[in-house]
Regions:
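Conserved C-terminal helix/tail region of periplasmic/extracytoplasmic solute-binding proteins
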Residues: 153, 376-438
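A structural signal for short loop-to-beta-strand junctions that line the ligand-binding cleft
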Residues: 85-86, 115-152, 180-181, 294-299, ...
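Extracytoplasmic/periplasmic solute-binding protein
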Residues: 130, 134-138, 143, 165-215, ...
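Glycine-centered hinge/linker elements that transmit conformational signals in sensory
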Residues: 170-172, 214-242, 287
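C-terminal lobe and pocket-closing loops
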Residues: 266-278, 291-399, 437
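Hinge/lid segment of periplasmic solute-binding proteins
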Residues: 92-143, 158, 192-196, 283-285, ...
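Conserved N-terminal structural module of periplasmic/extracytoplasmic solute-binding proteins
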Residues: 1-97, 112-116, 159, 242, ...
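Short, solvent-exposed loop/beta-turn-alpha elements that line the ligand-binding surface or hinge
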Residues: 26, 105-121, 186-189, 204-224, ...
Length: 438
């Protein structure tokens, strides 16, 4: 990709490779775009920039902060104008688009230096293309089932292992303004309808994509999932959840208004902040499965949040050195402890390291965190089960699955007809996004 970006300046491709292998002191200004904008994470990143500068006096790391949505606009417009950073945080779906735009440099040497076998293979695969790695995941979180221990015990219910048991338990709890069995979030401005359907389809050993890259919404498992969530929406969910986005949904659990919910370890701090009286009443369990005898920890949804280095950078060697510096053991653990239980180590040895586990929150919720960590080892982003695909971004960014639910619930469209229509729309959107469909 390098030569194409340089046009007539053929010599610059030689400079790139020499720079990658370069020796001598690191020097220059490294601009980093970071979407770690909240308090402790943001403070940590600034501190790392200062510490790296102290170690490498000729290098200054400049941190610029952008929310994830601002970042998305900024890098896509920046690519045309040449206004891109040297290093940045990213999301797996961004990385797919960046690789396709030839905007990134391979980071295999950095990964090997940190220790390739320390990373889960699926996490690295999300940033791989033609055998090269273009992203380095820095933390992970995974979707699991959260529940209220106090509510289950007051109703004499055990923790559901299957989808059928979950539906029965949620219906036994019922719905009232103070407590809902669970909420089924279907807002068209978010991806939760796709997320919940994906759980169900993954538990049946399928994906939301067929092997040829087209959408899978009309298989028996997919139709079963659509009917399942439609039924639970009608029977136990707040009516308004038809328009819920991520925060609306999470807030209900934070406030103690849902008995079951699906989310990551970020739920721990959310409940602690909103309902400190409930901190001993929440726990996580593996996602429900089809049959109780099915494997407990099937691959479902994991978010691996990566860092990338940009092709247009003139300080690639310095940017890579800073990236690697962030994985220094004690510094990396400090980062994870800034949101304990929410940001999980992507390095499997750190997950077991006493200096990581010896944290009040991590000790208190160790059983729940183990459930999440187990899923981190096997799951992927929705639609990326076979590596980086453009389809993954379409599945989660265009609200098509959510609109299908609206059509079933509001317009009373037949489930099979709505699923077939949505499948067709998804396939058209995949092609429009440049997906190569076999």
């Amino acid at each position: 990709g390098g030569i194409g970006m340089c046009g007539a300046l053929a010599a610059c491709s030689g400079k790139d490779s020499a720079e990658d292998e370069g020796t001598g002191p690191l020097r220059g200004t490294v601009t980093m775009w970071s979407s770690f904008t909240q308090g402790p994470r943001a403070d940590w990143m600034k501190k790392m920039a200062e510490e790296f500068h102290a170690k490498n006096p000729d290098v200054t790391v400049k941190i610029e902060q952008f929310s994830w949505s601002e970042f998305n606009t900024k890098w896509t417009t920046g690519l045309t104008s040449g206004q891109v950073p040297d290093i940045s945080t990213a999301l797996p779906n961004n990385v797919v688009e960046m690789i396709n735009s030839e905007a990134l440099v391979p980071l295999d040497k950095v990964i090997d230096s940190i220790g390739r076998d320390r990373f889960p293979k699926p996490a690295l695969a999300e940033g791989q293309s033609d055998g090269k790695s273009y992203s380095v995941p820095i933390y992970s979180h995974a979707q699991v089932m959260w529940y209220r221990k106090d509510v289950l015990s007051s109703k004499g219910l055990s923790v559901p292992k299957t989808w059928e048991e979950l539906a029965k338990a949620a219906k036994a709890i019922g719905k009232s303004d103070s407590l809902y069995g669970l909420s089924v979030p279907l807002g068209t401005g978010d991806m939760l309808g796709a997320r919940y359907l994906n759980f169900y389809v993954r538990s049946a050993g399928q994906r939301l994509l067929k092997d040829d890259g087209t959408a899978n919404l009309t298989s028996e498992a997919a139709l079963g999932g659509i009917k399942y969530w439609t039924d639970l929406y009608k029977s136990v969910s707040p009516e308004g959840s038809l328009d819920y986005a991520v925060l609306d949904q999470a807030t209900l659990f934070y406030q103690g208004k849902t008995a079951f919910d699906f989310n990551s370890g970020f739920h721990i701090s959310g409940v602690a902040t909103n309902r400190s009286d409930l901190v001993d009443s929440i726990a996580a369990a593996p996602l429900p499965r089809m049959k109780a005898s099915d494997p407990v920890n099937y691959p479902a949804e994991v978010s691996n949040v990566p860092l990338v280095v940009w092709e247009a950078s003139k300080v690639k060697r310095e940017a890579k050195a800073f990236l690697e510096f962030l994985f220094t053991k004690d510094k990396y653990i400090e980062f994870l402890h800034s949101v304990p239980g929410g940001m999980l180590p992507v390095l499997n040895d750190i997950a077991k390291d006493p200096s990581y586990t010896n944290n009040e929150t991590i000790k208190k919720y160790s059983d729940s965190i183990k459930v999440i960590q187990d899923q981190v080892g096997v799951g992927t982003a929705i639609g990326m089960e076979k590596g980086p695909l453009v389809q993954a971004g379409v599945l989660t960014s265009q609200g098509l699955i959510e609109k299908m639910y609206h059509s079933i619930i509001i317009d009373k469209t037949d489930v099979e007809a709505a699923a077939k229509d949505c499948e067709k729309k998804l396939n058209e959107a995949f092609k429009a996004a440049g997906a190569s469909i076999k």
